Regions:
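Cytosolic regulatory regions of ion transport systems
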Residues: 1-174
Length: 174
């Protein structure tokens, strides 16, 4: 059912962002072929949560609070990075971000948005060279492009790329 739903949605519009839950990884390849934007592995997530809680006391409560939309004082979120910081360092952005109240910068989410759009733009950019070896190298990078790739606490010299968002922990008002 899940695979058919994603196929139907993507047939209507490739730009619609789709997220699907999988209980069994054996269907993963079908969802990837259907251009599913995000695949959530419920069992894998549960196993990791259980393993993490055995090592770090209270981890399940922390994660539940961060992911819950109606409980807790804070939540994980992403916000757009102003254009003037694209091409600058994470350290520069982190210093400027310190001025925001009620938010803590914890990382960067690279290549955000529709995987179809991200890959088309990356492909166009990769083809802007007349050097064949550079072109091949660029195309290999596009093939390995990971959409919505989180980088938690990157080094200060990390260069902020286009289509990235800041991962933040924000205090809820109210």
């Amino acid at each position: 059912k899940t695979v058919m739903t994603v196929l139907t949605i993507k047939a209507m519009s490739k730009d619609v962002y789709t997220a699907a839950e999988l209980l069994d990884k054996k269907y993963e390849s079908y969802l990837k072929q259907a251009d599913c934007d995000e695949i959530i592995y419920s069992r894998d997530f549960s196993r990791r949560m259980l393993a993490s809680t055995t090592v770090t006391s209270g981890m399940s409560h922390i994660m539940f609070s961060l992911l819950s939309s109606d409980e807790g004082d804070s939540r994980l979120s992403t916000v757009g990075i102003p254009e003037e910081f694209q091409g600058k360092t994470y350290g520069d952005y982190k210093d400027a971000f310190g001025a925001f109240k009620n938010s803590l910068l914890i990382g960067i989410l690279e290549n955000t948005g529709s995987p179809h759009r991200v890959k088309i733009e990356a492909l166009r950019e990769a083809q802007k060279t007349s050097d064949v070896s550079m072109l091949v190298n660029n195309l290999q990078k596009v093939k390995g492009l990971e959409v919505n790739r989180p980088l938690l606490v990157p080094p200060d010299d990390y260069i902020l790329k286009r289509h990235s968002r800041a991962i933040i922990l924000e205090r809820r008002e109210g």
